[in-house]
Amino acid sequence: MSDDANSSLPDPLSWRPLKAPSLAEFEVIATEAFRRLPAEFRRKCEGVVIHVEDTATDEVLDSMGIQSELDLMGLFQGVGLPFQSESAPVQMPNMVWLYRVPILLYWAEHEETLGAIITHVLVHEIGHHFGLSDDDMYEIERLAE
């Protein structure tokens, strides 16, 4: 083959500079995934803070009885809508923790996009604590832009 024929092929080494997203890049992806969720769902989540860490702390894992830090992709901490009250004392904001390393490992083993996995974890962590059914959560994921 001539060099001209080979020039139309993609560079087989073009993947070499690719890396897994850093914590900062992962947070950008998570923020964008949240922004693409249906407006009605985002309104229910007003004030929810999204945190990204590599893995859950030992304290979190111990409190949940989880043996491996790789088994937890996300966690909601706070008070879900069914339990909120106007007369309740001031509380910390609701938070969703996304754990980068377990999510990246899941991504490597499955044929889903990273954005779809992050969206799924976000919706399910928030959704369970807001009393949504699995069907409701799948519909929210489907409607994500």
Predicted features, each with a name:
Residues 121, 125-129:
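Catalytic glutamate of the conserved HExxH
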Residues 2-117, 129, 133-136, 144:
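Active-site rim/adjacent substrate-binding subdomains
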